[in-house]
A protein has these predicted regions:
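Mid-domain Rossmann-like dinucleotide-binding core that forms the NAD(H)/NADP(H) cofactor-binding site
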Residues: 1-38
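Glycine-rich phosphate-binding loop and adjacent beta-alpha segment
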Residues: 8, 24-25, 63-137, 170
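Short, well-ordered alpha-helical microsegments
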Residues: 21, 42, 65-66, 151
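Local beta-strand N-terminus motif with an aromatic residue
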Residues: 30, 52-53
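Short acidic-hydrophobic, aromatic-tinged amphipathic segments that line or gate anion-handling sites
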Residues: 31-37, 142-149
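N-terminal Rossmann-like NAD(P) cofactor-binding module of classical short-chain dehydrogenase/reductase
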Residues: 34, 54-57
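Short amphipathic alpha-helix with an adjacent loop that forms part of the alpha/beta core around
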Residues: 40-51
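C-terminal capping/lid region of NAD(P)-dependent oxidoreductase domains
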Residues: 136-143, 151-170
């Protein structure tokens, strides 16, 4: 949604269920969504982005990062903010196998954590609150009742069982 607000011509999403993909397209206004559980992600990206991916925001890592690096456009960018697919892996994950595309496509890949931009929090909160208030940003909350259910709520993040921000109501 922010990409669209900031001028992106085409916005695609990748999610793990048909329901989440429909939400991305029907409610959030994405141009298309790919279900990584049931679709050929690489093939769909080739169809939807015939010139490659200009910008990929990654919170997942693993196979999805690999596939997207393989579909990078000339001077494409990859922003890394998470790697949730690897967090519970018993072994250390290897780097992406398509990293050479960063060289051949003259791409850039950079990681960050939200605290890197703490000096911009107030400004961002003001701007995003305005977008929410005027309906340009939509969101869902997945509310779990009771502190005793907090571990289950946290696990939803790793299994994809949530739709929206997970909140534990006490």
């Amino acid at each position: 949604q922010i990409a669209r607000i900031k001028g992106a011509e085409k916005v695609l999403g990748i999610a793990g269920t048909d329901e989440k993909c429909a939400w991305l397209v029907d409610e959030l206004g994405f141009d298309a969504a790919i279900n990584y559980s049931t679709e050929d992600v690489k093939g769909r990206l080739r169809t939807l982005c015939p010139k490659g991916i200009d910008l990929y925001f990654d919170n997942v890592g693993g196979m999805l990062l690999d596939v997207c690096l393989g579909q990078l456009a000339l001077r494409g960018r990859v922003v890394l903010c998470g790697a949730i697919s690897t967090y519970n892996s018993p072994q250390r994950s290897a780097g992406p196998s398509n990293y050479r595309n960063l060289i051949t496509k003259r791409g850039r890949m950079e990681g960050f954590i939200i605290l890197d931009y703490s000096d911009h929090f107030a400004e961002a909160q003001f701007e995003i609150a305005g977008w929410v208030a005027d309906g340009r940003i939509k969101h869902r909350e997945h509310i779990v009742d009771g502190l005793e259910h907090a571990p289950d709520a946290l696990n939803l993040l790793f299994t994809g069982g949530n739709t929206g921000k997970v909140i534990v109501r006490i």
